[in-house]
Amino acid sequence: MQGLLIREASINDCEGIQSVHMGTPGPWANAVECVPWIRKRIERGYYVQVAEINAKVIGHAEWVETHDIKGKFLYLCVMQIKDDYQGQGIGRKMVNDGIQLARAQGCEKVVTIPDEDTGSEKFYAKCGFSKGRQIKSVSIPTAAYGYSQNYKEVDSAPLEIIRKCHFIFGLSQASARHMWEINNEKPLGDNRVTTTLISDTGDYIQLCSQYNNPRKAWVLCWSNNPNPMFVKDILTLGRSKGFQEILFDFFAEYEAYFKDFTREIKHYAIETYKFT
């Protein structure tokens, strides 16, 4: 497309980014939240990407390098194109730009979670992405079961935990790094409290209230030797912090941890990837 430029964003692009996301959920369409969100992402080393035509921002994406226990990849957190410019190859060019960055950074693949409600999995298939692991989701009421092992409350989980331990719960985004950032490096104005426990064996559990429901928390959990009682430990922590429900997002391989609960486990998403 004539006049199209894909480039790294700056804080000065926030007004254009807001226009791209107008009418969508999330912080980018909000004039109060967009600037601190973009500033924090840039500070934390995300590749905040924009597409522009004749100096007008018409697309926005955010990528983050993730080096977890299974390898190194570049994760696409969000991508949005203005309605009037969709279907013109702009998204594909933004993806290709991200793939070039992934190669330059030594990442073995790029990964994302397509929004199945919008049919974006078809777009990624056309870009050469393959379907990976299934992500499932379940919400369970909190209860005072008691703890199955000794825990200590600490200020935060260290970033290096994503390289040392498997990411058991918390996959509302298929990147341990991105979810760690959301819970531990919040932008200015995000006053949600993250509670962190570490066990005697080095397992980490984090609870943080959801953006739109302060009585419901999502959980992040890292472990190399998952405790069969993890779920009850997490629900016990949730009850002690005043939450009514805990949201668990996880790869299907961990579904057995919920065999003692009657809540329906739902399909959430499919991890999608492309080797670089």
What positions do the PLM features span?
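Conserved active-site tyrosine of GNAT-family acetyltransferases
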Residues: F123-A125, F129, A256-F261
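Conserved catalytic-core motifs of GNAT/GCN5-like acyltransferases
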Residues: V111-I113, S130-A144, R263-F275
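Charged, low-complexity intrinsically disordered regulatory/assembly segments
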Residues: G189-T276
